[in-house]
Amino acid sequence: MTTSKLINYTTREFMSDHKLEQYITKQNEIFTPKVVEEFTKAGMLRTVLTKLWNKEDVHRVGILFEYRDEKAFATCQSLLEKYYIPMVKTFITKVVGSLGIVIHEFSS
C-alpha cells in the first residue's frame, strides 16, 4: 500500500443547501475515469468529498486530497487548474485550505 506524504484538506462553504448539492452533483462531471487516470499517474493517491453535517444551518463540504509526495502535489495543481477550477468557478463559496505533511497515521 502506498502511503500519503502530503495531504490537502479544504472546506467550501455555500450560501444554500441547494448550491451545495449542485456542487456535489458536479463532481462526477469533473472527475471522469479519464481525468482520474491522469491524477493517478501524476501521483494523487486518494480524494474524498465529505458533506459536513454536525453544524446547523451551515452548508459545507470537506475535500481531502492525498498525494504521494511534494512533486505529485505540484503536478496535480496544474491538473486541478485544467479540470476542476473551470467547472466550479461559478460557485460563490468561502474556501479554507490547509496543507499537511503526514506525521502519524493509523489504518486498519
Segment roles from a protein language model:
Residues 1-4, 40-62, 85-108:
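Glycine-rich beta-strand-turn "strand-cap" elements at beta-sheet edges
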Residues 13, 27, 35, 43, ...:
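Generic alpha-helical secondary structure signal
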Residues 5-14, 46-81:
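Short, well-ordered beta-strand segments in beta-rich or mixed alpha/beta enzyme
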Residues 18-46, 81-88:
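Short amphipathic alpha-helical segments
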